[in-house]
Amino acid sequence: MAAPLSVEVEFGGGAELLFDGVKKHQVTLPGQEEPWDIRSLLVWIKKNLLKERPELFIQGDSVRPGILVLVNDADWELLGELDYQLQDQDSVLFISTLHGG
């Protein structure tokens, strides 16, 4: 069984508005059978942090196009995207690159 993880989850570029305007969240992910990955983190975020309009953040089992995801300041595309296995003390940043005009 995977141990609980302490992870910093941060939202920027307007994405924080979907989370009551709170940019940084220090969260403890509970222990579970499978290791935590970005895919399971997104499910947890949707259930526990997302306050409104989930369609602006989640599309299918991933983030919507236009949301940049950084894990420890590295582009998640270099780390395996949804399959990246989270480590204790990781920092995951979601930045919306879509803005109204």
From Swiss-Prot:
The modification 1-thioglycine is found at G101. It comes from the Eukaryota. This is Ubiquitin-related modifier 1. C-terminal thiocarboxylation occurs in 2 steps, it is first acyl-adenylated (-COAMP) via the hesA/moeB/thiF part of MOCS3, then thiocarboxylated (-COSH) via the rhodanese domain of MOCS3. Pathway: tRNA modification; 5-methoxycarbonylmethyl-2-thiouridine-tRNA biosynthesis. One of its GO terms (cellular component) is nucleus. Keywords: Cytoplasm, Isopeptide bond, tRNA processing, Ubl conjugation pathway. CDD domains: Ubl_Urm1. Pfam families: Urm1. There is a cross-link at G101 (Glycyl lysine isopeptide (Gly-Lys) (interchain with K-? in acceptor proteins)). One of its GO terms (biological process) is tRNA wobble uridine modification. It comes from Bos taurus. InterPro entries: Beta-grasp_dom_sf, Mopterin_synth/thiamin_S_b, Urm1.
